[in-house]
């Protein structure tokens, strides 16, 4: 995939299938776990820390799979899916700047939920400010981010951590537990 400043859903689906470079590096999840419809802006120099910035969106469709099961007669998008979208985008950033490997969420220092996403909402906006990129021993990103709906910030995540790992094998050798 060519490095550019924005990506369509079609392009993100290619990254989910083939990886950013066509060789499997930095694959995004396939639908329905892909929680991003488009990246409107991705830059390496910018954002609150001048280390990078991502602006992306997900269109809300009233029949998204998660509304049927979370919760019956009280549909709410699970907060963990919004958080996963932030990890997905942070991992995308790592391969976008040239990192190689399979992306794995490593943690988050703090998450606050201040609202909820319902089927009647139209769009989710993700904003990610890259705080730091570490290239050795593991290619890794640290970021702060927010999730917005209807111009209101409803999730805030600080110190998101995603790493790229090479040498991960699936399935792992018999009797072994796969680790990073």
What name fits each language-model region?
Residues 1-76, 96, 101, 114-118, ...:
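Non-catalytic linker/capping segments at the edges of enzyme domains
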Residues 73-75, 83-91:
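Compact, glycine-rich, soluble single-domain proteins
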Residues 82, 117-124:
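Short nucleic-acid-contacting surface segments enriched for D/E, G, S/T with interspersed K/R
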Residues 105-110:
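Short, structured beta-strand/loop micro-motifs enriched in basic residues and often containing a Trp
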Residues 124-130:
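Short tryptophan-centered beta-strand motifs in secreted/extracellular beta-sheet-rich domains
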């Amino acid at each position: 995939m060519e490095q550019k400043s924005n990506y369509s859903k079609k392009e993100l689906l290619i990254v989910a299938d083939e990886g950013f470079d066509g060789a499997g590096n930095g694959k995004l999840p396939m639908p329905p776990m892909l929680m991003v419809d488009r990246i409107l802006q991705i830059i390496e120099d910018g954002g609150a820390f001048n280390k990078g910035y991502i602006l992306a969106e997900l269109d809300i469709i009233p029949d998204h799979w998660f509304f049927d099961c979370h919760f019956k007669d009280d549909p709410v998008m699970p907060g963990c899916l919004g958080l996963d979208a932030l990890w997905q985008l942070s991992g995308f950033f790592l391969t976008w700047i040239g990192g190689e490997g399979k992306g794995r969420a490593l943690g988050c220092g703090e998450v606050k939920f201040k609202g909820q996403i319902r089927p009647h909402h139209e769009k989710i906006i993700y904003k990610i400010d890259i705080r730091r990129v570490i290239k050795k021993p593991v290619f890794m990103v640290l970021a702060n981010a927010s999730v917005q709906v209807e111009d209101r910030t409803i999730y805030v995540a600080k110190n998101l951590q995603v790493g790229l790992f090479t040498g991960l094998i699936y399935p792992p050798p018999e009797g072994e537990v796969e680790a990073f």
